[in-house]
Regions:
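Long, low-complexity, mixed-charge
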Residues: 1-73
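A generic "cationic amphipathic patch" detector
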Residues: 2-31, 91, 126, 150, ...
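Conserved beta-strand/loop scaffold segments within soluble protein domains that form the structured core
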Residues: 59-305, 309-312, 333-351
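Extended amphipathic alpha-helical segments enriched in small hydrophobics
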Residues: 306-328
Length: 351
């Protein structure tokens, strides 16, 4: 076992805030073996099992990148060369025999393409486990790509995840992130808006319970003119769960008339849960627009009382409030079966 520091912010702030990175003490390296529990829905034959080493500008850290490149037990490449009519769905299920997953997903979306890609991580309730994953997306000009990553792992498995994307001229990308699982749930997201009028939306929800530790580090860099970034994050914490949110929008030289905004809101469902946030706007270009906000609060007593006057218990009323805050992200996923799966998990985890 060893101590490990990961998920560094692109610009450091005072150590007193305790948010520049996250330290995991007594980190235990996994024993990696074959992973067999994977289900793929790919009606248009876009997926192949192909190993490609990935380079990350940020990511979680050298240890996790090297592990993914050298020791992965699932490697998938998704080639999108047309406008797909049906979604691609990849589902990993961790169980007692498949409790260590090191997966790489490489998405290559060519110019003028369209795709809806959904990746789901699930697990049995009782197992300990380990997940280190990377999703890398190269999005060509005038493409329209929606990537959904759904983390429904239990609260005993350590979850480490990196998302990396490069977005070209006039392409539209939406990343929907559902972050519910993981004893440690540490996520690094990076998007490079390289092309003129490229758009990147990141819509994320998180839910923490028990003693979960959530560390979200979302970084976007705008290079192209008239690029647009929209980061919307909503979460809830109960029991002794703790969350760090770090959101960075960086306007690079040349990104004239670019726009970027980020908003994060955390609902505290207990007096022992804890939330920290660090929103950052960085800029080396004059003619841009940027805005950010973060807020943390408890459930509004008046709203809670109003719902309970309708004969609804306090627990069910809080579930309704949380699901209402999550609704826009869940509805944006489009696949009704996945929506219902997420809503059921909200109910189960808030019981």
């Amino acid at each position: 076992m060893k101590n490990i520091v990961l998920n560094e912010t692109p610009v450091r702030t005072s150590k007193n805030y305790g948010i520049n990175n996250i330290e995991i003490k007594d980190f235990e390296e996994p024993v990696i073996k074959e992973f067999k529990n994977i289900k793929i829905t790919d009606n248009e034959n876009c997926i192949s099992s192909e190993k490609e080493n990935i380079n990350l500008k940020f990511g979680l850290g050298e240890y996790f990148l090297n592990q993914s490149n050298e020791q992965s037990n699932v490697d998938l490449k998704i080639n999108v060369d047309k406008k797909l009519k049906e979604p691609i769905i990849i589902e990993y299920n961790l169980d007692k025999s498949n409790n260590v997953l090191i997966d790489n997903i490489n998405i290559n979306a060519k110019d003028n393409t369209k795709a809806n890609i959904i990746v789901i991580y699930k697990s049995a309730d009782e197992i300990n486990g380990y997940h280190n994953g990377i999703c890398n997306a190269e999005i060509g000009a005038n493409a329209n790509i929606h990537v959904t990553i759904v983390n429904l792992l239990n609260t005993k498995i350590n979850n480490f995840y990196s998302v990396n994307s490069n977005i070209e001229d006039e392409s539209k990308s939406l990343f929907s992130m559902v972050e519910f699982g993981g004893k440690y749930n540490v996520v690094n997201y990076y998007a490079k808006l390289a092309g003129y009028k490229s758009v990147n939306k990141l819509h994320s929800i998180y839910l923490g319970k028990e003693e979960q530790r959530i560390d979200l580090n979302y970084i976007t860099e705008l290079y192209g003119e008239k690029t647009n970034v929209d980061i919307e994050v909503n979460g809830a914490l109960k029991d002794k769960a703790k969350k760090n949110f770090k959101g960075t929008i960086d306007f690079k030289t040349g990104s004239k008339k670019a726009k970027g905004k980020e908003n994060e809101y955390c609902t505290l469902l207990s007096d022992t849960s804890y939330s920290k946030a660090l929103p950052m706007l960085l800029c080396t270009e004059d003619d841009v627009e940027g805005e950010h906000s973060t807020a943390t609060g408890k459930v509004d007593d008046n709203e809670l009382f109003y719902i309970m006057t309708r004969g609804i218990s306090e627990k069910e009323a809080k579930k309704m409030i949380v699901k209402a805050k999550f609704n826009s992200v869940i509805q944006g996923i489009k696949e009704e079966e996945i929506q219902n799966l997420i809503l059921e998990e909200v109910d189960r985890r808030l019981d």
